[in-house]
Amino acid sequence: RLMAFSTLLCIAYLVANTLLMGFSLSTILVTTFVWCAFNVSVSIQKLVVAFLPIILFVLIYDFMRVYPNYMVNPIDTKGLYDLEMQLFGFNSTNGTLIPSEYFNNNHWLITDILSGIFYLCWVPLPIVYGLYLYFTKQKRICIRFTSAFLLVNLIGFAGYYIHPAAPPWYVMQYGFVPDFSIGGHV
């Protein structure tokens, strides 16, 4: 029964994903992996259930492409920039700068490396910590931790839609007018 339910769920996800976002081999591979992991053995099934909140996070994040935040509310390019300038702006030889403008002009290798590491760890580190909790027999804490991870990210997603904002690099490079022809930037 559980296998039939998980199979139906995976097929429904693949159909919805394909209809809304187009065919993707990576989606099929990930869905197949989750289905196999869920149906291989009871012990692995328990691991998948413990990490269901993180799987939900990934699915929700993926489906956010279907209805972009700028279709819900207008993108704020100036308001948050001005607020950051008031709260964190500081004087330099180039005038008053927000921190990202300052660090854009003053690269320090160690801060660039540390920033990159912290940025890259915001998803993998909680997953590793969740696995640590799970495999050290702290399954209840693992489930609470992964659920908290999902909740915090859902709050972030809500903020992303309630008040869409341009990142500091966008304002530095393109100004305050939204231009949807510009691609992503890392």
Task: Name each model-derived stretch.
Residues 1-27, 42-126:
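N-terminal transmembrane-helix/juxtamembrane module of multi-pass inner/ER membrane proteins
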Residues 28-40:
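Central hydrophobic cores of alpha-helical transmembrane segments in multi-pass inner-membrane proteins
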Residues 36-39, 130, 160, 164:
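Structural signal for membrane-spanning alpha-helices in multi-pass inner-membrane proteins
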Residues 38-49, 134-144:
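Membrane-interface helix-boundary motifs at transmembrane edges
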Residues 67-75, 137-138, 165-170:
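Membrane-interface elements of multi-pass transporters and channels
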Residues 147-160:
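Small-polar-interrupted transmembrane alpha-helices in polytopic inner-membrane proteins
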